[in-house]
Amino acid sequence: MGSAGDDYEYVFPDISVENERLAGQHAGIKVGMGGRLCMAPLDLTRPNLRIFDGGTSDGYWLDDLKKELAHPETCDLIGGDVTGERFPTNPPPGVKLEVQSSTGPFPSDWLQSFDLVHQRLTLAGLGNQSEHCVEQLMSLVKPGGWIQLVELDNSSHEPNGPAVKTLGALVARLAEGMGADLKYRGGGMEKWVRDKGFIRVGSILAPVCMGAECPVPNMRDQTTKAFSFTAEQLIKACKRFPGGLKVMTDEEAEGLVGRLEDELRTRGGYFPVRVVWGKRPVDQ
């Protein structure tokens, strides 16, 4: 996901491998959130819910969320992404995928029409437009509805091994290279949501497991592969920025993926994601 425009280019271009990476990442984040995808206290037993997922890729989040809905067949599930290149030929049943940037503009009939608006791991790629993006997403929430935002937070406090710490540094370098101001971190998202008049604003810092730290055995290999591929693609992307990698030399980068894979299989690691939610007042 990124800013609007037909010339948007994904950092992770290999669609088949990227979908596998996203599945591993998704599984790790879900465990970190206690096995839940929706932390906002929305009543998922209600029929006819209308839900939007920004930066949806192939709609995997919405497809998994259906399992938490009591009446998914009655719900309107819409995923938007800045380009449709990752949309499958046959979308998940009950999920509609639309080419739509999260920075807007949105169709007028979408405004204040959704019970839940969700977006995950998108703001780092939007340069200095992160606050604008959040404001645009909030405009979709109906009175009494909820927004939920999920983004990486500072991982320096985690007792990770050297390879995982380097992965975190590469993520920060990617954000810097793409012009991100990172103001959404450290309470920024909560402030934006609250300043726009939303109420019942809450947040958690969810620990996302990788490799050997995953409590579910089959996730250890899945997340190891996913984050090793992430490191490989981050190296390629960051080398293209003016100034190059910065956080390591090209020589050090050559063996990082192998070192990371070994470290994840033997030691594992964690990175934190900030989950923020808020409710539009019924009279707003």
UniProtKB/Swiss-Prot annotation:
Single Gene Ontology BP annotation: methylation
Keywords assigned by UniProt, alphabetized: Methyltransferase, S-adenosyl-L-methionine, Transferase
Superkingdom classification of source: Eukaryota
Pathway entry: Mycotoxin biosynthesis
Family of the protein in this entry: Belongs to the class I-like SAM-binding methyltransferase superfamily. Cation-independent O-methyltransferase family.
Physiological role: Methyltransferase; part of the gene cluster that mediates the biosynthesis of fusaridione A, a bright yellow trans-fused decalin-containing tetramic acid with antimicrobial activity. The PKS module of fsdS catalyzes the formation of the polyketide unit which is then conjugated to L-tyrosine by the condensation domain of the fsdS NRPS module. Activity of the Dieckmann cyclase domain (RED) results in release of the intermediate fusaridione A. The unstable pyrrolidinedione ring of fusaridione A is opened through a reverse-Dieckmann reaction to afford its ring-opened form.
Protein name: Methyltransferase fsdD
